[in-house]
């Protein structure tokens, strides 16, 4: 209880200092009683915004999340895209039922009609959604000495989930060298992205791997277990493949040489250069006239 009381006193001091400094500078004061709001999905949410020092205040609310920006309230009225689920009051805006898409930063902007006085404050809304079952990509085999990447992700958790890896049911530490059970392995683990990288892969890395997603809300979710085998490079198989390729190439060269010795290529050449003879019938000729009309074309 003492901690809550101290936090309340700090909040009151901040509010008082904001109001006094704004009045001293001749500006309006805009503040919120709860700058960080966390609400489960499908529940109502109140975003507070209070102000003072405005003769005729005009209130607007803006929403921003990543590249998305939209206007929730304009000139003290909720915009059409939010009208069916948000209400406006002079103390803030209220969502009747929030969805995960409502997560983001809401800025309350207050000005007077003349535009001489202006102030704003931001409220972070986080819609709480438990994580779903994560999807993993784990190679079934990895060559010892190479680099292997295992990934884990899920799309529903809000706030975003953190990811923890397990090998044969034992949670993998961030620093393998500091743990006796994992000191023979060399890997890096990113709990934010869910990526597990072995570099290089060792024989000890053979085992069943699972990934767990958790975000502090709802139950943690685990993936299916997938086994990864760490194996030596199959040098014998590579050598055998090279030998088979060389033998086949040798048979091909021998076949071409045999066909050449048998004269198959010469016969083909002679067949394509054989002569053609065309005979034409002699035309009728008049008496006393002799003309050669038969011709041979070679």
From Swiss-Prot:
GO terms for molecular function: virus receptor activity. The modification Phosphoserine is found at residues 280, 286. It is a single-pass type I membrane protein. The chain crosses the membrane at residues 238-258. The keyword DNA damage does not apply. Residues 29-237 are extracellular. Residues 29-126, 134-227 form the Ig-like V-type domain. Gene3D superfamilies: Immunoglobulins. Disulfide bonds join 49-108, 152-211. Keywords: Cell junction, Cell membrane, Disulfide bond, Glycoprotein, Host cell receptor for virus entry, Host-virus interaction, Immunoglobulin domain, Membrane, Phosphoprotein, Receptor, Repeat, Signal, Tight junction, Transmembrane, Transmembrane helix. Glycans are attached at residue 184. GO terms for cellular component: bicellular tight junction; plasma membrane. Its main location: other. Residues 1-28 form the signal peptide. Interacts with the ninth PDZ domain of MPDZ. Interacts with the first PDZ domain of PARD3. The association between PARD3 and PARD6B probably disrupts this interaction. Interacts with ITGAL (via I-domain). Interacts with CD151. (Microbial infection) Interacts with calicivirus capsid protein. This is Junctional adhesion molecule A. It comes from Felis catus. The gene is F11R.
């Amino acid at each position: 209880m003492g901690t809550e009381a101290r936090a309340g006193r700090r909040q009151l001091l901040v509010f008082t200092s904001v109001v006094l400094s704004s009045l001293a500078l001749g500006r309006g004061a805009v503040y919120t009683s709860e700058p960080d709001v966390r609400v489960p999905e499908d529940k109502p949410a109140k975003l507070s915004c209070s102000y003072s020092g405005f003769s005729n205040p005009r209130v607007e609310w803006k929403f921003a999340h990543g590249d998305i920006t939209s206007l929730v309230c304009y000139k003290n009225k909720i915009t059409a895209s939010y009208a069916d689920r948000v209400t406006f009051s002079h103390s803030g805006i209220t969502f009747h039922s929030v969805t995960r898409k409502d997560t983001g930063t809401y800025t309350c902007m207050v000005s007077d009609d003349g535009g001489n006085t202006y102030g704003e404050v931001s409220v972070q809304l986080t819609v709480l959604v438990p994580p779903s079952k994560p999807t993993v990509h784990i190679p079934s085999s990895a060559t010892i000495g190479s680099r292997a990447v295992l990934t884990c992700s899920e799309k529903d958790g809000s706030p975003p989930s953190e990811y923890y890896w397990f090998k044969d049911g034992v949670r993998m530490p961030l620093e393998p060298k500091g743990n006796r059970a994992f000191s023979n392995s060399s890997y890096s683990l990113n709990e934010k992205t869910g990526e597990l990288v072995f570099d290089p892969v060792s024989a000890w890395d053979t085992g069943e791997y699972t990934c767990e997603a958790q975000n502090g809300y709802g139950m943690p979710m685990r993936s299916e277990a997938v086994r990864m085998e760490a194996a030596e490079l199959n040098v014998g198989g590579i050598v055998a493949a090279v030998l088979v390729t060389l033998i086949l190439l040798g048979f091909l060269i021998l076949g071409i040489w045999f066909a050449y010795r048998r004269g198959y290529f010469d016969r083909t050449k002679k067949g394509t250069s054989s002569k053609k003879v065309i005979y034409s019938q002699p035309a009728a000729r008049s008496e006393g006239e002799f003309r050669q009309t038969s011709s041979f074309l070679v």
